Amino acid sequence: MQIHVIKQGQSLWGISQLYSVPYPRLVDINALEQPGQLAMGQTLLVPTQNRYTVQQGDSFYSIASKTGVSILELRQANPQITGNVLYPGQVLRIPQKPKPTTLVNAFAEPYPKTVDYARTAAKALSWLSIFSYHVDAAGNLRPLEDETLLQVAKSNGVKPLLTITNIKEGADFDTELATTILTSEQVQNTLINNVLTTMNQKGYSGVNVDFEFLGIENKERYNQFLRKLVQKLRPQGYIVTTAVAPKTSADQKGVLYEGHDYQAHSKIVDYVIIMTYEWGWSGGPPLPVSPLPQVEEVLRYALTVIPKNKLIMGINLYGYDWTLPYVEGGPFAKALSIPQATRLAYTKQAEIQYDQEDEAPFYTYYDQNRKEHIVWFEDLRSYAAKFNLIKELGIAGMAFWNLAFPYPPLWILIQDRFQVKK
């Protein structure tokens, strides 16, 4: 598969002719609802069978990044090119090598559209983490209508994971609720029994524990709870994972970070999912949601205390649209799916740029009130860069938040670059 970046004046018909790929297949692979409306800088996935057609502005470095091979491998496969100059239209051979095996998890909430998106993604998934069973102060689980998502997972060979959270009813992740749970043996025992009963009754394959904003006072209490949970579930063959905040040191300050003990989790649970996104978030200044240098910094620290075969990178399926100038405490940025972001770029006649350092696409536009906006999001290039990092570090896999934001070409790209563990 080749990643093509739309240039000025290009049409899907012209791209189909350039690559000798049927027009309907390009529409299908990229799930294009309006194939005549392509934004400048938008990325498309093109089936090219181990060859790459050079685009304007390409270099050996950019082609290696897009295709997931090294510059050396690319040069060795194309000895006819002796210098560094490449010309648009040149066809390079892309060497084939065994695909690395990876775990792919996606979080999904049980809404009708999300169920449809889960069906689309299923072939590229190892796990489906159904979000979420809220835990109350007595250790009870708030009921969740998860039957349809469970059926989608099981019918596609995907292991469903039950996600439990300390989300307070009608609110968000709650420190006080977590403290109530983690300071009571009785509440914890009730919770563990409820988790086990629900998994047995519904056919879950494991649990993901997503307790957030714990504070330092709950760090060791949380570790102890996880030990008790694993002691109860592991003998029955259940997978146990945790979702943790992105840290670059063990003593990183802040209520979001201090309760998550990377090293302890790595010794207790089967896998640790690091939520490596939200540098750019809806209430903060405009930034890439998951800039690759910062993601890499977190993962490289994590690898000093977590075995690589237990470490999973979190990846966002969305971007944000900020109104400029950013004012602290002002209106929150609007979340967008990748198709929404590219459609908006087309509508506003904005050219999508690409930040090579952060490995993230962005663009600016003016709304009807002449207010400037900036949109940071993801595309096939930024995902390919993240996949290259996963391969380089040799970590266990990736976890996507969340399937409410559809992007069908992504699941095809994953299967092109990896052997998905089922």
Residue ranges and their predicted role:
Residues 108-123, 185-200, 254-263, 378-389:
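Short, acidic/polar
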Residues 96-190, 194:
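Glycan-recognition patch characteristic of GH18 chitinases/ENGases
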Residues 163-178, 317-386, 418-422:
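Glycan-binding loop/region signatures in secreted carbohydrate-active enzymes
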Residues 1-19, 42-68, 90-92:
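Primarily a LysM-type cell-wall glycan-binding module
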Residues 129-132, 192-221, 271-285:
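Active-site groove signature of glycoside hydrolases
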Residues 128, 209, 272, 313, ...:
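Conserved, mostly hydrophobic/aromatic
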Residues 137-142, 220-345:
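Substrate-binding surface in catalytic domains of secreted glycosidases
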Residues 386-422:
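Acidic/aromatic/glycine-rich contiguous surface patches that form carbohydrate-binding/processing clefts
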